[in-house]
């Protein structure tokens, strides 16, 4: 019985795959053999040199062959499987079911090679293909190569900044990214695009693929696809041109199968070969591509990303490749698609692309930074770019001769691609033929001039003209049109180039939305649980609200709170992390972005409804609202409509903004509008005319009206204790002498009709209810439609490629613009070419002084096991080895072999069951181990606002001992900058990808951050050359070699080393899948020791021209589809080398265990290199500097506070002295408090990036104490909040026109602009450090804020709270902030009631109003507006503002008591923040959400079975 299994660890490349027999060996299936043969591989290759060479020659010949010209050798390779395909094909109607093939089956070779193309041709199904011509193509972008980064200082000097911006914009210049590029790729050809990072390779691919929106200066020249102009191609046939970017962006919580199935489903043609069903087509296409790229074992594993555990980095890259291929483009542009792949898998990728071009006639442009000779030989043509200029285009076998005639000679054992790329490196090694020293071109301009004057260039232009004459453009269009119509769904629009209809796209996106929700359970569970908890608490707060007039305000408060809670929850929808994925799928033409916008809305709706239903049922019946079915379902209906409308509104805002800071600012203003203009806080009659219109454009106003109408229509509210006058002495008076002191009352009537109350207080009419329903539908559909429209038309921000942004005052121009034509010309390139490579020799020697380490790191029988699928899975299997000072050890293996897992385990970064010994000098590692070792991760994660130099200086200060002089640390940093050749951009900000350092520069910074720490034990490097070109990789390895020679111990994983690069290493640790050792020992001169071991143990002989690194990976069966019969792990266990290694490990342990060692860190090991105070100083400086330069964040915060202050001030402008004015003053203070919600969202969005950096990299190196991350985040926010809250104070306080005395104003400022800011900064961070991610933090924050708001005494007076909950009123800090702010505003303020606020009644005959009510007034307060009248007495409930304060349980006398309580709350927030982070992130306590989804999982499984 066969089984397949897999496991992956976040950030690692560990996986298990394969089909296991009862003896544990890999059983090769015909599917494996088929895929291997199609990729040009065979297990017969192991028989010797001839087979290997023959295999390569077959591939080389097939490179230029058509489908009908496949060689007999290729056919012979598959002849042994002769019968099975016919059986399986006949069963499935021509569709090959790879999952059902078994090894004993045989199939017909001709059918498998020609089945798809031949059957399609026989059935009249057209397959599209087209060549590409580029003529004199140039691309220009904004000249941002040396920009200065803006800071908050620019805001402080705003007038000058505005003037400078206008000046720069008027005189803005463009820079040339691509200059006069030409090329020709016929259908079925592969073109390799070579160049260093920044040379324009990615830009050329984007231009070729029609992705030209980002080029601000536009694209010139002619690009045609078999004669079809690019503009027409993009309009009519966009799906056929695919650009696959370098970054692997996927929905991290989807599994591999879900990811591939979705892409295939979006591209499933309507007319399919042999009329197979849609489900069969999806399954077979997925299985085929997953088999080719070795992904079948990962079907049920999440794709993951840098922060979500999933498949390994190499497997994620393969998912990206497979996803692009299933989109069925005819022209592909692959941007560095082999990044992160091991050498064997990279070669298999190239061969797979070769097969698709041969059999399907597709055209491929590919950039590869480190291409082996085998990969190079799979291509037809190659072009070389040098800083945007083309210096060669032609056949691959003529490129080397072209540059040889130019005067350059390829050094021995240097692969062709490396030779070609090296020519464009001014610092690289160039072997010049004798006599050509002064003739060869050296600068980009000279190379370009030589190329354009060459016969090869003239022949290229002739070939392009000839090709354009040969092709029949109209016939190509006809075939394209017919093919697309065959593929297109019958319900799709006629002019649409999408395969499936818009409604099918929505269905697929909805299904994917459900899968994403199920994959990311934490957020959904937190949302539903928050709703249930909040409803229980709030429902009990309003428990059995009185049905009399005393409960009317509370009933409105319950309904308002329901609306406000779900409005706050809408802020959690401001997500930007998925935007790159939507952009990629738009490029692939999988679906309309609008379909995703609608699909995600539909998918989220049921889960929101679950939470909302639970929420409303609980709060509705606990609070004692109208218990009739009609009222309940009307409230339910309008709450649902409003919630969905507000969610759609916030999603609309996110869709229209470029970043989350902008979205948070705008959403904060919208949130204030929702809170203010619902008509609960300020009613329509009291609204100022300049803002009244806002209430009419928000759905909450109509929802609130209809919900109030459902509650109060027809309700008779008894007066209860609100009769005036009443009490002692008024027991026996007639009813006509009393009145309800409530809006809507009538003289002599002891109750108030709910409809009268709503009409007078709110101007609400029952006839509006269903009108409002129609209006809300318009809002909901309008917001959704606008969101879909903006999502559809939103384009990426225009720019000019990678742009360096320098720290203000330090920028350096390395390029100059020609004033006349704007072209770029490099300065002093010749001088740099000839002299610069030797200028850093001295500094390189200086860096290695006193570097020698005496520590030997040993690991013995290391095993690593983790829980998996209800059991345990072993990822490392008794791995042993050692690293000695002065040695450079390579750690190799295919993707999923356990390289990163081993590094993480040895570096003490894994959590799980770890057994075995890890020793330093024979002794167990101590607490200083992490900081005494360096670890360069695969992910290049840095603080974007710091410069390169500042990042290195911070690492040096934190990682080196405090007793090392500051000058020495900084000198060492400067040496590292020189050695890594980072001087030109040392003062450049790290920035983000595309606007900051490029991939190469980021990788160098990652290495530099560890080198400046001067680790005295060991340096771990995980793929340090990934994403770099061959020259940069060589420079990095040479640096490591020098470090090793100086005494450093280095263990380094490496994926695609060239032969020369590989032989720079001293020792090799080779792993196979399962974390099993295959070899550990010396490599030897020219790899002789290593090759001898493999050849002696059954591997074929390695030819002299082969790359040993590729040879050994092939020998052990590495690769996505490869397999071998030998068990190389068992061979290693039985070898003499293994016995020798074990003996040496034991000898080292015995020898070193009794020796005493010394280090820079002193005798007593410590976890951190520096003191807490020293760490605090520099972490605070770094955090403050980062915030100072984050202008988007600061401006968003300033806009929120400034606009918010003006908004509140002029909404409640001069509220007056009436009773309504008192309420509006209370709400003005209350809404000022609510403004903290979006402000805290802003804080959390920024702080999460610092948390992720610390947890992924800095904490693992014990760089500084974890508490400093929290404290410095808190402290760095304070100055900006103080400043912006001062602006808020001025713009909101004085328009209220209450107290202008300096004393009152100053105390108000102290309460809000100082104390409240200190409070909510800490509160927002406290919630963030509790949550697993930002979205969950937003939900938890909304829950907590709703608690604080509900219990502060505004929406529910404390007098009406159940006795149990009065402690929460006393506990809520918002209670005391509101008390003080309202107390200052209303203290000693006289009250003059308006006419409608007066309670009118008649006194008994013969008495004046004053005489009749005197006893009542003495006890209850208030005043009679007409004391001497004998009829129509006018009673006002309050005489001064302090009476109102007493009613809401506040008092001016509480002022300084509350001030003391503020400090207690602020201190509690800080302590809670530290404690929560310790519990959830240091101790690692986490919650499991799977059980909550158990029922949903069962339903899903049943659904699958039924299908």
From Swiss-Prot:
Residue positions the entry lists as glycosylated: 55, 336, 626, 659, 878, 1311, 1428
Q: Where is the composition biased (Basic and acidic residues)?
A: 41-55
Task: Cite the entry's keywords alphabetically.
Answer: ATP-binding, Cell membrane, Glycoprotein, Membrane, Nucleotide-binding, Repeat, Transmembrane, Transmembrane helix, Transport
Which residues does ATP bind? Answer: 893-900
* Domain ABC transporter per the UniProt entry, residue ranges: 157-412, 857-1099
TM helices/strands, residue ranges: 522-542, 556-576, 605-625, 635-655, 665-685, 773-793, 1193-1213, 1220-1240, 1270-1290, 1314-1334, 1339-1359, 1459-1479
GO CC entries: plasma membrane
Molecular function (GO) terms for this protein are: ABC-type xenobiotic transporter activity; ATP binding; ATP hydrolysis activity
- What is the recorded membrane topology of this protein? Multi-pass membrane protein
Expression is induced as follows:
Expression is increased in clinical azole-resistant isolates, displaying amounts of transcript increasing from 3.3- to 44.3-fold. Expression is controlled by the pleiotropic drug resistance transcription factor PDR1. Expression is increased during biofilm growth. The expression levels are significantly down-regulated after exposure to the combination of fluconazole and tacrolimus (FK506).
Instruction: Say yes or no: keyword Cytoplasm present.
Output: no
| Location in the cell | Cell membrane
Region annotated Disordered, chain positions: 1-73
Q: Name one GO biological process term.
A: sterol homeostasis
Spell out the CDD domains in the cross-references. ABCG_PDR_domain1, ABCG_PDR_domain2
The knockout outcome noted for this protein's gene is: Leads to increased susceptibility to fluconazole. Also leads to increased susceptibility to 4-nitroquinoline-N-oxide (4-NQO).
- Which InterPro entries does this one have? AAA+_ATPase, ABC2_TM, ABC_trans_N, ABC_transporter-like_ATP-bd, ABC_transporter-like_CS, ABCG_dom, ABCG_PDR_1, ABCG_PDR_2
Role according to the record:
ABC multidrug transporter involved in the response to azoles such as fluconazole, itraconazole, ketoconazole and voriconazole and contributes to the development of PDR1-dependent azole resistance. Plays a role in biofilm tolerance to fluconazole. Also confers resistance to 4-nitroquinoline-N-oxide (4-NQO).
Q: Which PANTHER family match?
A: ATP-BINDING CASSETTE TRANSPORTER (PTHR19241)
Family statement drawn from the similarity comment of this UniProt entry:
Belongs to the ABC transporter superfamily. ABCG family. PDR (TC 3.A.1.205) subfamily.
Task: Please identify the protein, giving its name as recorded.
Answer: ABC multidrug transporter SNQ2
Q: What is the organism of origin for this protein?
A: Candida glabrata (strain ATCC 2001 / BCRC 20586 / JCM 3761 / NBRC 0622 / NRRL Y-65 / CBS 138) (Yeast)
